[in-house]
């Protein structure tokens, strides 16, 4: 068998000399250059200030939610358990992208090694897909709470919640591993300028020096599975929720149910809408400037919405924050 392979290989170069020249001139890429916002010149300094402020708001908001949910026993419910997991995932999700982007806004050298680029894409997609799946699970949690309140303790027991959270994380990172393998198994010859502020799929795969149709098709199928399927599941859940809410006799009960669901639905629409715009289309249709603005939405604006809209405006969370701060204040006075 090895002899046959060697013979075939030698014949290929004998009958097709251009392939030999191509192989000799092939230079594999060892690092990428992240162009980011370099075309904006001096505006980058203003962007640095804005993005740094937003990053600190995201970080402080998520840390506050995680801490309050952990410290206040009244929030030890499935809904807030998943909120805490989502906030944790969002914290790491932004940490993978934003610090490097902030550094690049102030530096001339914007290089990232081949391996670091692959790792950045792996963790970014891992946490992003985990968030998508978590939003789907949270939709199911609201469906179980509103449509089946009597069976809710059984449907969303702590054991079930733990398994669902673990399934989201495992599914997210397995899907990410599949996509990253499809991207970085491609040959990258000479072009190394990534027209983006991080190693995103479309921007990197455009640099491959071979046909990428099969890889792109499989990545598209993965995108459908992690974006369209959970979104449709959420839509069906909310149709059932809406039907149940309309049957609630009291106006206060309907208002409270609508308020809880509306905050979740607003985050879902922004997150899935922006992600679908970027990933559920061929790479050939990638338009860098427009796509970069949309990417900013789901890498910065959506993580900003989660703590502000979904949790900090929630009366239970606000009350819990006051209780936690009140306890700390009383402890200081006592000491």
UniProtKB/Swiss-Prot annotation:
UniProt subcellular location: Cell membrane
Glycosylation sites recorded in the entry for this protein: 25
Membrane topology of the entry: Multi-pass membrane protein
GO cellular component entries: membrane; plasma membrane
Cytoplasmic side stretches: 67-74, 141-159, 238-257, 313-335
Keyword Protein biosynthesis: no
CDD domains: 7tmA_OR10A-like (cd15225)
Residue spans, topological domain Extracellular: 1-45, 96-119, 181-217, 279-291
Protein keywords: Cell membrane, Disulfide bond, G-protein coupled receptor, Glycoprotein, Membrane, Olfaction, Receptor, Sensory transduction, Transducer, Transmembrane, Transmembrane helix
Ranges that cross the membrane: 46-66, 75-95, 120-140, 160-180, 218-237, 258-278, 292-312
Keyword Disulfide bond: yes
SUPFAM superfamilies xrefs: Family A G protein-coupled receptor-like (SSF81321)
Disulfide bonds: 117-209
Highest taxon listed in the record's lineage: Eukaryota
One GO molecular-function entry: G protein-coupled receptor activity
A Gene Ontology biological process term: detection of chemical stimulus involved in sensory perception of smell
Entry-linked InterPro entries: GPCR_Rhodpsn, GPCR_Rhodpsn_7TM, Olfact_rcpt
Pfam family, one: 7tm_4
Role, per record: Odorant receptor.
Family named by the database record: Belongs to the G-protein coupled receptor 1 family.
Protein known as: Olfactory receptor 10R2
Species of origin: Homo sapiens (Human)
